[in-house]
Amino acid sequence: MIRKILLPVRGDGKGDNVFAHAATLAVRYKGHVVVAHCRPRAEDLMPYGIAISAPLRKLLLSQSANVADQVEDGMRKELESLAARFGITLSDKAIPGVATTAWIEEQGRQVDVIKRHGRLADLICVAKPDVDRNLGTNTLKAALFNTGRPVMMCPPLDSAPERLCDHVAIGWNGSVEASRAVAMTLGVLEEASEVTVLSTGAEVNGADSESLKEYLQARGVNVKLLRFKSSRKIGRDLLQHCAQVGADTLIMGAYSNSHETETVFGGATQYVVDHSGIPVILVH
């Protein structure tokens, strides 16, 4: 069951949408959303390789700190507004049976903040990377490769999702990553109204999709199996079949091949990351 959700934010304008997804889950599971803002150190904003006088350096440090204070204050107020909008209680700690949210502020690199807080989160919510603006890729990578926890990639939406984790699709290929994805999201699967296993039936040296269906049925999951013909564009096929069955969330193992290989040469995970229009829970 999802009890603690981490939401790393950085003032890039994507926080509201991701919070809408996290809030929807918090209300559904009575969970606690930790909104973690990574505040850059003023020293890191200094011009690199340029000699500046001590008075100018002091002035720049002061101005950087003031700007950071303004950003933090604005984001705190935005969180308060969003919490009220979604009916979530502001609380530094989780309250059993109540959807809550808290704000934390830390200095340093965002990857370190994600490591520290993500490793004890049931789910990490991040924005879908914006390739055109070069935003979000490092956040997704940090969450996937440095925490060992499930990561929900949230697509950009104009409003909160009407359904989330209600009809869940599983992209199954019998791999260790896929197995881990199922194991780490059992709480989601057991609470879903419907689960559809999507598979080509080509699980080489891995557990087959029929065995996964039986495994989930033994846990009381309402699950069905959909096999489709294998092609060289598995990522595209997964998304098409998600739309076909009406799934609102996809769960899959992430980057069975290396991230660099998939990014350069293409792969199922990278296609889904680039093209998905529904939330995707990824596990590496």
Question: Which residues fall in each region the model found?
Answer:
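Short beta->alpha connector loops
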Residues: 12-13, 107-111, 131-132, 175-176, ...
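Gly/Ser-rich helix-loop-strand patches that form or flank binding pockets
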Residues: 15, 19, 26, 111-161, ...
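Hydrophobic/aromatic beta-strand patches that form the interior of the parallel beta-sheet core
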Residues: 34-36, 104, 125, 152, ...
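A short acidic, glycine-rich active-site loop
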Residues: 57-74
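Short, small-residue-enriched loops and turns at beta-alpha junctions
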Residues: 132, 202-206, 231-232, 258-259
